[in-house]
Amino acid sequence: MESGSGLLVRRIREGTVIDHIPAGRALTVLKILGITGREGARIAVVMNVESRKLGRKDIVKIEGRHLSPEEVDKIALVAPRATINIIHDYRVVAKRRVTVPDIVEGILMCPNPSCITRVGREPVKPRFRVVSRQPLVLQCVYCGTLVSEEDVAEQLAEGG
């Protein structure tokens, strides 16, 4: 990425670039990926840069790592318009938009304290269906409670 005075962040040789993250959500993406900065891998986080599509956006570059499908699904919940770029020898060899899965299971907790998934006696995984993708709204299949994109991002940022 370039600015009027040159590159803001160096290109990476091998790894993953997550682009078009909503402004302010890059740190949540790092949390989802379990990245603390102590792993030794080179990580670049750019926040609140100009974007034609989003107005402002965040970008995360991770050298030497590719994402699992489960990680991509989680990222889609907090950044539904993100793109995942796979980098090999400084070049983008694959580019893919994330897609919010139709069913989200075992990732989030239902916020309803009376939901069967919250009662300790029942070993039921929380399960949500997508009601809306833009803006993201999920609905618990057991109790019908609606969960907004902001609530999802908050849960995932807390490690939930």
Curated annotation (Swiss-Prot):
This is Aspartate carbamoyltransferase regulatory chain. One of its GO terms (cellular component) is aspartate carbamoyltransferase complex. Belongs to the PyrI family. GO terms for molecular function: metal ion binding. The lineage of its organism: Archaea, Thermoproteota, Thermoprotei, Desulfurococcales, Pyrodictiaceae. Involved in allosteric regulation of aspartate carbamoyltransferase. Its cofactor is Zn(2+). The keyword NADP does not apply. Pfam families: PyrI, PyrI_C. It comes from Hyperthermus butylicus (strain DSM 5456 / JCM 9403 / PLM1-5).
